[in-house]
Amino acid sequence: MAKRNTFREDEELEEQINLHDILRIGVYLKPYKARVIRILAVVVMMSCISVVVPYLTKVMIDSAIPTKNLTLLGELTALLAVLIVIFELGLRYRTVEITRVGQLMLKDMRRDIFTHIQTLPFSYFDSRPHGKILIRVVNYVNTLSDTLSSGLINVISDVFTFLITLVVMFVIDWRLALFSLALFPFLIAWVLVLQHFQRRAYQVLSNKQSNLNAYIHESIAGVKTTQTFAQEAAQFKTFQEQQNDVRTSWMKAVHIQFLMWPGIQTISVMTIALIYFVGVTGFGGVEVSTGVLIAFVGYANNFWNPVISIGNFYNQLITCSAYLERIFETLDVQPEIRNAPDAVDLPQIEGRVDFNDVVFRYEPDGRNILNLVDLHVEPGKTIALVGPTGAGKTTIINLLSRFYDVAEGSVTIDGHDVRSVTLESLRRQMGVMLQDTFIFSGNVRENIRYGKLDATDEEIVAAAKAVHAHDFIMDLPDGYDTVVEERGSTLSAGQRQLIAFARVLLADPRILILDEATSNIDTRTEEALQAGLNHLLKGRTSFIIAHRLSTIENADEICYIDHGQIVEQGNHAELLARHGAYYRLYESQYAMIKV
């Protein structure tokens, strides 16, 4: 996993092209091997035609034209015409099929990245800007389009054409063939010198593109704060800095890339000139007919065109290797929480929850966040967790939902260790409402239905009524069909939380978890919500985290958490009677209300 970074920080990449990453592209070709085989068959046919055409030209010049054999000339011309038509048809088929296979591969790659990201732990998303994750799913995969759509298979065609042309050239005249290859070592040296600088340039470019994307994503998410503090100019200045970094990196990368072409083209032209010189002057004892000389020039083009094409592919490969490294780095991040090999589905539960001497720490050698937490909850009971910020309240419910695993001890539900059951079956019987409520773009009905995708409209309305969300929903322009923007920006904080609460209740979980679920709801809304919750909590084991003690006074048991330990435990009246930490917290809130 990449180290924690911000939009200003570049991510570390390999210095050299990672051949393993490039070979992994083959995994995405495998499902389409039948198509690829057909394409390769067409490629072989086209390569053979490209070799036959110069030879037929040689025969025409050396045999048909000098002897004025019109019959042979007509036959050769007709054969050339047929071969050219077949070649063009093959070219069209190859282009269309390669594009289709390439797009199918990209679709599969996007699917794998998106699916994999859904399984990654919270720590992955906490360790980097979301914009840097987004660019991997969209921009980097799109950048691979040309390489996967044409480059990979075309380079196979080019290599085959290169080899078969080389063989034919040596068969016709091995000495002239050697002269044709005389400048080839200079080409190899030119490519090797440039590839190191080009690889590094595109790594820097991908870093700067990632940083810019992360900054834009962050700026859009925080645009209200920017406008509130009138910091538009400062934001624009930072944007310009990031954008200039991208432009500078792009120009450096392109400058190096464009150095490749003049070198290849120059060596290609010099090779053809050398063939003419040797063939005409008889240098080195080479004696060839005019037809052979013309054919060799054609073969030289057949020889150098693939070399130029391979050079182009190599350019693309250098560019894409930096992006492939980022994509596969994401795919190689293993979820910290996975199903055990022998995991079984959690059966329908009653809701007994046991924390047995639980110890938790984020890092193996880090400090303990929870210390020997021992908590036993009977089915249907409501447990409230209170205490100062950072005491470990949210960590307790994260362990219950198995977003993290305990370091020592165990968490069980109806006697089943949560590590021994499948994640889907565990979380399917839980309803979790986090402090940071998320509303998806779509209408209100779809957002509530997210808790149970096959829910009827009647069930949706019933859930909304239960949490007293129905009235405000009906006051919206289109009621339940009112379209809300991403993150529910057109709704108030309280309305967003009520919709999210209805979503959780619609799932009808056996265990209900509310993490600061009413922290952004005004007192009047909270009172309406509390009235609906009183009967909905019955029959469900419920865990409630709340800073407002008024929302948990009716809890069956209240646990005061401090420094990762349960320091007080009992109901509201019992804890007040002890005049301990809970009593002091209650008194401080009551004093604030009086003021």
Region locations from a protein language model:
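Membrane-integrated ABC transporters
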Residues: 1-50, 65-76, 93-98, 102-105, ...
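Short intracellular "coupling" helices and adjacent cytoplasmic loop segments at the cytosolic face
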Residues: 4-13, 103, 111-141, 214-238, ...
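Transmembrane helices of ABC transporter permease
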Residues: 31, 35-48, 78-79, 83-89, ...
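An intracellular "coupling" helix at the cytosolic face of ABC transporter transmembrane type-1 domains
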Residues: 33-34, 122-123, 139-148, 152, ...
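Hydrophobic/aromatic residues in alpha-helical transmembrane segments
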Residues: 53-57, 94, 113, 164, ...
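Helix-loop-helix
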Residues: 65-75, 168-182, 252-325, 330-331
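Alpha-helical transmembrane segments of multi-pass membrane proteins
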Residues: 83-102, 149, 153-160, 179-205, ...
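ABC-type nucleotide-binding domain
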Residues: 339-340, 346-595
